[in-house]
Amino acid sequence: MKKTKVTLLLDIVTSETFMLMSRDAQAAYLQINARSDSKGRTNRPRAIAKAICADPASVDELLANRFLVVVDEEMGIVEVNKAWEEDYSRTQL
């Protein structure tokens, strides 16, 4: 059975790794996801975090846990990692 976008998001936000992150990182993830383009990309992750009064360092937490992936470092573009899995985050760190 193919998972839908909602099912994938639910898998992510109910994962142990996600739930152990700071509230700022959790909120930033949801807002970045909501405000990204159709490919899940944005060049403003820190501005989005700041706009919701989350610590801009929460973006670093999302990157460290592989919930966000840098697509273009020079342009500052990140992508929401839609292929994220609990085991994946642990093996990649």
Describe each PLM feature range.
Residues 1-93:
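Positively charged, structured surface patches that bind polyanionic biopolymers
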